[in-house]
Amino acid sequence: MTGNWLIMEMNGLAQIGILYPQFILSGQWLSQALGSLEEELDRQIYPDGFQYELSTGYADVVINNYQRFIEVAKAFGKTVSEGMLEKLAKACELDVKLMMPDGCVPDINDGKHRNVEETFQCRKRIFPENKTIRWITEKFETGEPDFTSIALPWSGFLVMRTGWTTEDSWALFDAAPFGKAHQHEDKLSLLFYANGKLLLTEGGNYAYDTSEMRRYVLSTRAHNTVRVDAKDQNRLKNYAWKEEDIREKADLKWKLGPVWDYGESNYREGYGENPCPGTVHNRRVFFNKSQKEGKTPFLVVVDRMASDEIHRYEWLWHIDSELEAVQKGRISFHEIDAAFSAEEAEVIEGREEPEWQGFKAVGTKQGMYRKLPCVSIKADAGQIRIVTVLSPCKGLSGRVHKVTASAMPEEDSVVISFEDGTEIAFREQEIIQTV
């Protein structure tokens, strides 16, 4: 037995060893369980605190099982090592690093949109003096993190935010390894929270059944990344977890600054039933936080596709807002604009044929899903560069008129023209070098 199941079993064995001292082997059971629990922390938790399934649901399951053992151990006068407590505290603090402005962690992989304060009210029982936990649960003034945006170098997520209030903006870039279990085919996907809402969302987590909806949420189709020739990413096909993977850093570059945050990664493991690594997707994400002229922070996403053959590329953006207008180079929603340097685009919502597209799970039980607009941008090419701007808006502020950017991969200039007459022009390398 491995993974979170092993931790559950060792939690149970440890508690039996504590609660039933009349059994001759109780001490041996406790010792065996403690040894395994210590080993699994090193085996399953990345140095940045994320459990190796990379799920915001199962990371919590693992911590819960350690906490249940620790509370019983302390109640019966048993010693819990400082090393175990330190590693668990770091794993707990991951929730704050990932936390959206609504106070919840995002639904990553087979994850859960989970309230951090509710979780930490429980965690406080084993970490009563932890400043981060007290900041969340008691509004403890000195516990506020000394960072806003942060990278998780081993688990491969980049969290970009403007601050810690409910009015702030937040974005998540997924450059993660595939993870040990409960994975979705979603490398290079993005989430974006602004104006009090997760505007750029995804399919989410759904019931563990064999339905079309379950297949959809697992697939690239349900995420904000690129498909090739109507085929999804397929890391699962050739995937095998290795023990040393827990110590390997992810393929993630980043820089964080007062005006721009930047992240970059690649997907090169192939698409379709028999994936061949002939197509490389490089994605750069630029998060503008300046809020000049009253604009809400916005995302600039630069994608470069590279192949020796001509392919049909498809960019997907799942927007949780009411559609207003479809125009050349721009699709407007009530709360956000999606502007792009490609020419061909459509909005798909609640489509079941020829394949499911434009849905979002609203729970993990069967039937708990709804329709959701999905922007589909397409281009035929071998080598191509496409720039997409995702700009939240209130009234005229933030409305994008157009994006001007060359399709040549070697070019790096971007010009964003807004409806209010303002313009932002930059070169990718200038931002990367000066952040």
List PLM regions with ranges.
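Short, charged, amphipathic alpha-helices and their helix-cap/turn boundaries
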Residues: 31-43, 388
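CBM-like, beta-strand-rich accessory domains located in the C-terminal region of large
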Residues: 3, 112, 118-120, 206-435
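Carbohydrate-active enzyme catalytic cores, enriched for enzymes
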Residues: 46, 50-200, 379-385, 400-435
